[in-house]
Swiss-Prot record:
GO-annotated molecular function: rRNA binding; structural constituent of ribosome
Pfam short name (any one): Ribosomal_L27A
Protein name: Large ribosomal subunit protein uL15
Its biological purpose: Binds to the 23S rRNA.
Comp. bias regions, Basic residues: 21-34
GO cellular component terms attached to this protein's record: cytosolic large ribosomal subunit
Keyword Nucleus among record annotations: no
Organism the protein comes from: Frankia casuarinae (strain DSM 45818 / CECT 9043 / HFP020203 / CcI3)
Length: 159
């Protein structure tokens, strides 16, 4: 076992072990303890004399008497309804593209084809044209979507 200049002890022949590791010299500086005796950083501990800065901490949000940021910004208007139901939208034109042969269409079918995701409610809107008879089951329908699906020979089921 020997040491090389300025490094941790090296164990010869037995490999490096965790308990032999040491930080590099000068890597860890000791914390300066302030206000302990008459030396540097003693007595007033580098805070000067008197005043609120010497007696206690000034709040982090304090801007030196300037109008604070939270008072300079405008107030937010309105509110956000926590109970609002956010629908995933599918148009009748999309239904006609995804199901050209017609038939039964459910939320699971739409999710399988990538038109909607997961468990959020689905609303069918009447944008576009439809010419196949579809029997659509969804959470909500617009009036124009109901008309177009019925006109094409299909039916609507609200689940």
């Amino acid at each position: 076992m020997g040491t090389e200049a300025g490094s941790a002890p090296v164990v010869r022949g037995r490999g490096l072990k965790v308990h032999h590791l040491r930080p590099a010299p000068g890597a860890h500086k000791s914390k300066i303890r302030v206000g302990r005796g008459e030396g540097s950083k003693g007595k007033t501990a580098g805070r000067g004399t008197k005043g609120s800065k010497a007696r206690k901490q000034v709040p982090a949000r304090f801007e030196g008497g300037q109008m604070p940021l939270h008072m300079r910004l405008p107030k937010l208007k309105g509110f956000r309804n926590r109970f609002r139901v956010e629908y995933q939208v599918v148009n009748v034109a999309t239904l006609a593209e995804l199901f050209p042969q017609g038939g039964e269409v459910t939320k699971a079918d739409l999710a399988a084809r990538g038109a909607v995701r997961g468990k959020s409610p689905v609303k069918v809107l009447g944008n576009g044209d439809i010419n196949v008879a579809l029997h659509v089951s969804a959470d909500a329908f617009s009036a124009s979507a109901k008309e177009k699906i019925a006109a094409a020979g299909g039916s609507v089921t609200q689940s």
